């Protein structure tokens, strides 16, 4: 059995915690790197060891290791989350008009919040009591004298994955950069109060309402435009119907004039051949005249049928045109109905 020696170390002082956070700020690109490979892990271990050396350089009497400063940082982060949640609960308990959904969102954001730091190098650490509270969470460190080397790569990678799993930025929120956290509850950096964010959901709701109102107005304008288009098509339909009637009237007039012209032609032919009729016998005259009249009648009937055929063809073409316009209007009406159903709240 290997013996475990327990050595009680003193808590981190305010100066050590201040130095710890400053050094993490300088190396946040390495510590909070999204990549997880051997090279990055080695760089992270080196960064934590450098931070431990800077903390030890403060001269408080304790020699901190990279693992200890990592644990100290995680304790500090956990304390910040607890204070944030307590502050939110106090707001609700005091009757502050914070909706339940806003409280849940704020707590969720605090749980998933990535710890980062301000770029300001001049820190003013005023709330010393909070540092002492945070320091109390790290009261004892076990030093195991076993064959397994704490500085081995396997140990460091395992410890790093265990302790920094909630610190490394999540891929779901990779667009967020690890900037400085809101640590007003831990210590006071300035006396300017932060702007309350409880009205952000109401602001988003108002923006969505305005968007829906604008979309509704646009749909109303589109409906009016379709109504005007429908009326225009109706007027066009009436105009085409009048044109058809006019065309038919002109066609009938043309047929009447054609018949009149044939009538006058027959009369002219009958007056130009009196001598021929006198020379021919009475039998030939009676036989020739009915044949000519019958031929002219057949010719006129043939022309009339051709004109009627052309007129029916024209009417068929116009009917197909109106049917296409009717179908297009029906499709447009159906599209507008579907669009309204999709945008109404």
Curated annotation (Swiss-Prot):
It holds the Pfam family Myb_DNA-bind_5. GO terms for cellular component: nucleus. It comes from the Eukaryota. Keywords: Coiled coil, Isopeptide bond, Phosphoprotein, Ubl conjugation. Residues 202-344 form a coiled coil. Residues 4-77 form the Myb-like domain. The keyword Phosphoprotein applies. InterPro entries: MSANTD4, Myb_DNA-bind_5. There is a cross-link at residues 9, 114, 142, 237, 254, 273 (Glycyl lysine isopeptide (Lys-Gly) (interchain with G-Cter in SUMO2)). The modification Phosphoserine is found at residue 106. The keyword Phosphoprotein applies. Residues 139-175 are annotated as: Disordered. The modification Phosphothreonine is found at residue 188. Transmembrane segments: none annotated. This is Myb/SANT-like DNA-binding domain-containing protein 4. It comes from Mus musculus (Mouse).
């Amino acid at each position: 059995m290997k013996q475990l020696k327990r050595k009680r170390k003193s808590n981190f002082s305010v100066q050590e915690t201040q130095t710890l956070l400053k050094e993490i700020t300088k190396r946040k690109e390495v510590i909070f790197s999204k990549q997880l490979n051997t090279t990055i892990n080695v760089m992270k271990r080196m960064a934590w060891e450098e931070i431990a050396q800077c903390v030890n350089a403060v001269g408080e009497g304790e020699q901190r290791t990279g693992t200890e400063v990592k644990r100290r940082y995680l304790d500090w982060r956990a304390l910040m989350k607890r204070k944030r949640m307590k502050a939110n609960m106090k707001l609700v308990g005091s009757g502050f008009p914070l909706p339940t959904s806003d409280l849940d969102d704020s707590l969720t954001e605090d749980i998933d919040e990535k710890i980062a730091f301000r770029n300001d190098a001049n820190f003013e650490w005023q709330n010393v009591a909070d540092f002492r509270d945070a320091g109390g969470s790290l009261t004892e460190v076990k030093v195991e004298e076993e064959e397994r080397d704490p500085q081995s790569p396997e140990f460091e990678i395992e410890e790093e994955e265990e302790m920094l799993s909630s610190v490394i930025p999540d891929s779901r929120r990779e667009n967020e950069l690890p900037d400085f956290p809101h640590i007003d509850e831990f210590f006071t950096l300035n006396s300017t109060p932060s702007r309350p964010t409880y009205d952000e959901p109401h602001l988003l709701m108002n923006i969505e309402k305005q968007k829906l109102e604008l979309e509704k107005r646009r749909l109303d304008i589109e409906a009016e435009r379709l109504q005007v288009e429908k009326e225009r098509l109706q007027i066009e339909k009436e105009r085409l119907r009048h044109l058809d009637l006019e065309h038919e009237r002109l066609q009938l007039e043309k047929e009447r004039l054609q018949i009149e012209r044939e009538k006058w032609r027959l009369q002219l032919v009958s007056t130009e051949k009196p001598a021929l009729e006198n020379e021919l016998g009475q039998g030939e005259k009676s036989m020739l005249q009915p044949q000519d009249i019958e031929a002219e009648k057949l010719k006129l009937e043939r022309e009339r049928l051709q004109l009627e055929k052309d007129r029916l063809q024209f009417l068929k073409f116009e009917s197909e045109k109106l049917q296409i316009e009717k179908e297009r209007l029906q499709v447009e009406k159906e599209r507008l109905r579907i669009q309204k159903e999709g945008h109404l709240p």
